[in-house]
Amino acid sequence: MLKIGLTGGIGSGKSTISRIFKERQILVVDADEVSKEVLKEHPEILTAVRNKFGDNFFDENGEFTRREFGNFIFNSEPHRKEYENIIMPYIKKDIVRTMKLYESLNENVCVLDAPTLIENDIYKDMDINILVWVDKATQIKRVQKRDGMSEDEVIMRINSQMSLEEKKKYVDFIIDNSGEFENTIKQIDRIMQSVSIMKGK
């Protein structure tokens, strides 16, 4: 089974590319969804979070306020790293288990959609890696429109991530998602042909 890593930055349109793969009947593992599932399945993760970061991110019913916590760690690289050290082993284990299952079912291709594919070295376990790239102006505009943030807030978020230019060094293919949707589709088709993704599909 061909394992493909798909990554990008905030506002790059990675979710759109992921959806296109799904529409092409290609299996996609969404690392963000996996992270939500492991939180449900492994209560010890939230115990570790509470021990490390305190009670501020739990409501009066003891429920984890995921969005508030996300905003908190997004603005602090040391805190984000501490959280990733807690949760990432569970995420990686679940991803490996899911991909092994798909392989045992004789699936030809599986795409892993992961925003921190490179930062957490998951790209090394993939056969091919793809970056969804956009220019910075487009990135800022899209996030402002989607999330209602100020330009300064968006720039701060972008700067808290590994830059798309840096990510380019680690991937095999780049999809320029700055332009027309039709152009993005053509690029995906070319990549799919190059790695024979359509074989058996």
Swiss-Prot record:
One of its GO terms (molecular function) is dephospho-CoA kinase activity. InterPro entries: Depp_CoAkinase, P-loop_NTPase. It comes from Clostridium acetobutylicum (strain ATCC 824 / DSM 792 / JCM 1419 / IAM 19013 / LMG 5710 / NBRC 13948 / NRRL B-527 / VKM B-1787 / 2291 / W). Pathway: Cofactor biosynthesis; coenzyme A biosynthesis; CoA from (R)-pantothenate: step 5/5. GO terms for biological process: coenzyme A biosynthetic process. Gene3D superfamilies: P-loop containing nucleotide triphosphate hydrolases. Its main location: cytoplasm. The keyword Membrane does not apply. GO terms for cellular component: cytoplasm. This is Dephospho-CoA kinase. It catalyses: 3'-dephospho-CoA + ATP = ADP + CoA + H(+). It holds the Pfam family CoaE. Residues 3-201 form the DPCK domain. It is found in: Cytoplasm. SUPFAM superfamilies: P-loop containing nucleoside triphosphate hydrolases. Keywords: ATP-binding, Coenzyme A biosynthesis, Cytoplasm, Kinase, Nucleotide-binding, Transferase. Its EC number is 2.7.1.24. ATP binds at G11, S12, G13, K14, S15, T16. The lineage of its organism: Bacteria, Bacillati, Bacillota, Clostridia, Eubacteriales. HAMAP family: Dephospho_CoA_kinase. Catalyzes the phosphorylation of the 3'-hydroxyl group of dephosphocoenzyme A to form coenzyme A. The keyword Cytoplasm applies.
